[in-house]
Amino acid sequence: MKKLLLEAPILTRSGYGEHSRLVFRALKLKEGIELFINPLEWGSTGWISEETDERKEIELGIGRFGALMDQANQTKQDPGFDYQVHVGIPNEFKKKAKHSVCVTAGIETDRVSSDWLMKTHQGLDKLIVPSQHAKDGFTSTSYEVHNTQTDQRVTLICNSPVDVVPYPVKEVTPAPLDFTIDTTSYPSPF
């Protein structure tokens, strides 16, 4: 069984919290992985408090993560994650597995920061974004940087493949409303 670390603001009431739960729902269907969850904060947003079956599944993953990290700390060994999925902004990413993916919404402009591009040179194996616009922000941005140790100028570009995976759309069939409104009891304003 492969160990997969999901680092995400999965319990927050935020856009990234909802995105994290979408990723969780997809990952839990994948056979052959053991899911460990590190619940991250997202600013000062509150956390979901409802006790649902999904919440219980998330709590199990959080418990597995805590137990594994306790064991790793006691034995002074690496927890040995095979895969890491980090949901959030790229500058928060730190590589913790053999294969690492960052799922991010990107940014609503035509370029990303140099800090985000630097992360693609620091062990980020793939970026997943929800739109072509977000992908273009990563793949079209470049910066000229000066390496003060070598005195060379180089161009900083995205060094990871970027895949577009749009948000799913839930089809809802509205239930018919069965009610009548009696408007005869209201005086006419005319």
Task: Describe the role of every protein-language-model region.
Residues 125-186:
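Donor nucleotide-sugar binding/catalytic pocket of nucleotide-sugar-dependent glycosyltransferases
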Residues 38, 103, 165:
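Hydrophobic residues at beta-strand termini and immediately following loops
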Residues 2, 98, 190:
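Nucleotide donor/acceptor-binding cores
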Residues 33-35, 100, 162:
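Hydrophobic anchor at the start of a short beta-strand
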Residues 19-21, 98-100, 115-118, 141-144, ...:
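Short, glycine/charged-enriched secondary-structure capping and boundary segments
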Residues 5-7, 46-137:
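Extended catalytic core of nucleotide-activated donor transferases of GT-like folds
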Residues 1-44:
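N-terminal subdomain of nucleotide-sugar transferases
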